[in-house]
Structures are given as structure tokens and as C-alpha cells.
Amino acid sequence: MCPILMGQGTDKVEKTTEKRITIDPLTRLEGHGKIEIFLDDDGNVANAYWQVPELRGFEKFCIGRSVDELNKLTSRLCGVCPGAHHICSTKALDHVFGVDPPETAKKLRELFYMAHYVHSHIAHFYALAAADFVLGPGAPKAERNILGVVGAVGLEIGGEVIKNRSYAQKIQEMLGGKATHPVIGIPGGVAKSINEDERAKIEAMAKSCVEFGKFTNQLFADVVLKNQDYLNLIVNKDVYYHETYYLGTVDKNGKNNFYDGDQVMISPTGEEVARYREGGRDYLKYIAEHTLPWSYEKFCYFKPVGWKGLVDGKDSGIYRATPLSRLNVTKGFTTPLAQAEFEKYHGTFRDLGVKGPVHFTMATHWARVIEMLYAAERLLELSQDPEITGKHVRNPVKEAGEGVGILEAPRGTLVHHYVADKNGITTDVNLVVGTTNNNGPMNLSVRKAATALIKNWMVSDGLLNAVEMAYRAYDPCNSCATHTLPGQMPMDAVIRRADGSVYKTVSRNC
């Protein structure tokens, strides 16, 4: 076992007598989830499950609404990634109404979206993931949080984290009316243009975000890559490793693009096996969703291979759509600093003997901070574009119909698919969100980590946190992912007295 995953400091490994270990609630993720680990008679892991016990149901209650409301409604899917849903939904509405936005509008949307990426990746790396690396997997539970990270790295760095994330939020607010649940997008364009004063303010904040992106990549190099234990953790095939298919979006030159481009699926050995056409409108040729009775979250798979269960490898249709996936699919970045980090990333793994895609789940964290830097650089580029203050920001729409919007959300490839009648009323909605793409892989990762770490009845808080690290790398957003109802919805209403005791429990199963 990788030494850093063994008992650290006050983390005490003890023998359990339980054959069922439940981690509930899970920590440092968006939404609710739990992990169930089942031990065999020898105290080793027989199976483990990543479960999402919450339901949101957005697909159903979008039906019957005016279709042009959906980019405002679906942004309520989540308070962490409303920008991704809003922009993707707006792209779907362009298609629904048969309109292509002006170039200035496209650039303003992307400008907004790059700020969203910066905010999201900063939030995940520093608030959710960093504690596992800065403090260590086995650090005391009470310290494994953002306050513990700030205590370890210092108030000055903590201040920079808060400042630059707030800059990203302020840019979204300036462009979108508000940072959370924005209203920038309308079918055929954007709601408003920006003036030179606003552009200059955005440029100044973008410059700070670029510097912070550079700092974050250097911090990752110093804290993680230069620590042999952490490097061993990343490249440990026994704990955090799966050979899967990968999905990502690239531009016409094969370079990374979050807002627009072709969606490309590659095999575990790196060959291109599918490319979405017509703006992703043929996505249903390539991906499908499977349901299992123990989760409200669907399981995506690569349709030409098919659903073979929760197994990895070339013969399984399970694929990943994450920052790791995007760096496997893309030929590089269009911005210089991110491209330099991209070359360092792949060069490091080549030196470690990796040929083809990088399959190490923990490398997703490295990929994410590289993407943060790219988003900041692209944010700066767009803020300096002479066309960004143009006044032609909307084209007229046509009669409503059917439309698909697709882009790269921070957590993976996102699809919004709407059908409307001639009156513009929504008759069907399909959402394939980043986390749904990764539901199968997260289950695989949790099971593999648990199997590798829990042996002979021996368990500790640090080891269970190391199991949680398996899903944390994916940055799951469970509010987004549990948007539909695959089966029944059991519900308990618990009525309590003033002293907290239970007076009555009313159950239903419908």
C-alpha cells in the first residue's frame, strides 16, 4: 500500500466487527451521497457502492413550461455550476429557435463562461480537494477542510484564494446580472452588451486570475509533485486507476475548447472511436443511460460498446468525462501558459512509462489546475478582444422546434436537449450532465479504493477518507446529476414534537 494512505499521526487503524461500513454523509462535494462498503467473512471488501439518495427531478417539471424560460429554470439545478447549465441551455435554445448568435454575443457568453470555470475550479481545488494533499489523507477529520488548508498555507495565500474566486464571481455578475442563476443568455444572443469601462475592469480582474492560475500550478508542483509519497499516490495502479473510454470537446485543430467544438470519444488506448457531428446533435448515437435500483443517478455508457456492468476496460462501455478526460482527448491548449503546463503534464507521465491516455484518477486534480490556468488566460484574451464591446448582440429567432446544446461543464460534458411545440411549450427534456457521465467510473473508483485499502477487518478514519478521495477527484455535483426519476421515489415524512422526539412517521412509495 502507498505509505501515505496508512495511518497518519492521530489516525488509528482499528479492527472492526461490522460487515457493513457506511460513510454517510460524504464530505467535500456538492449535494448528498453515501458509500456502502460490504466485507466478506475474511474482513476484506466484497463490494462497495457510491450512492446518491437525493432527487431533483428537473427534467419532469421543465415540461409544460415556455421553452425560452429553460435557461433560467435549469440554472437552478445547482448553486455551484449554474453558469454551465445557463450557457448550455442557451445554446440549446439557439437551436430550438433556429438562430445563430452574432460573434460578439458568442464571445460575451464565452467570457462569462471562462469566469465561471475559474470560480468553479478554484472552489473545488482549494475548498474540497486541497485538504487531502496539503494536510494529508489521514489528518484529523476536524482539520480536513478549507480552514485547515488556510492554517497550513497561511492567511496571505488564503486571501488570494478568496480574492480571485470573488473576481471570477464579480465578472459573472457584471455580465450575467448575477453570479448565481445568471440571465445573460437569450435565444440568439445575450441580454446586454458591455461598455469600455466594464471591459477594462474585467481585464484587470482577469490579469489577477492569470497570476493566481500560475501560482496554483506552482503550488501543485511544490506540494504534490515534489513529494514522492504523493506522486506515488497519483500513479498507484492498485488504488486509483481505471482504463476507460474518455470524452472531451476540441476545436477544429484538435485543441481544448470548453464552449464549442466537436465532442470526441477515445478508447482506453487512445484511438478516436466517435465524434459528435452537427454541434453534438447526434449525441444519442453514441451515449445511452442505464438505471440501477439503488441510485437516483443514471449510469452513462458508450453505446457502440454497450452496458456491460460496473467494469472497466475496452470491452466495457463505461467512459469518463472529466478534466483528466479532456487532457487525454485534446492535442493541447491555445494559450501559452496552459500549453506549457500541458506539455509538462504529459512529459511527466511519459517519463513514468505511460504510453497513450493517462488513466490515473488522482491526476484529475493536476488536470483541473491546468484548466484553471487556461480559463484565466482565455478570460484575459477575450477581455482584450476589440469585438467584445460591440453592440450587435442578438439575432431574431424563428419558430420553436427541437434543439440540442452541448459544452464542457467543469465536471464533464454537458448536454441539454429540448423539444417544443409550435407554441413554444416544452414537450420533452433530456439532460446529460457531467456527473452522470461519471457515475459508473465513480462507483468503480470507490470500489477499487475500498478493496485496496480495507483488509482483514482493519479500518480507520483516514483510510475511509482515502476511499472518499476516489470520488472527490471527479468533483461530483449530485444536485445536477439526480435530475430525473428512474424508478420509485420512497419518501418519509417525520413529524417531531417540540423536544425532538418522533411523534409520527408517514411513508409513501410512489
Residue ranges: model-predicted function:
Residues 2-411, 433-510:
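Active-site bordering "gate/hinge" segments
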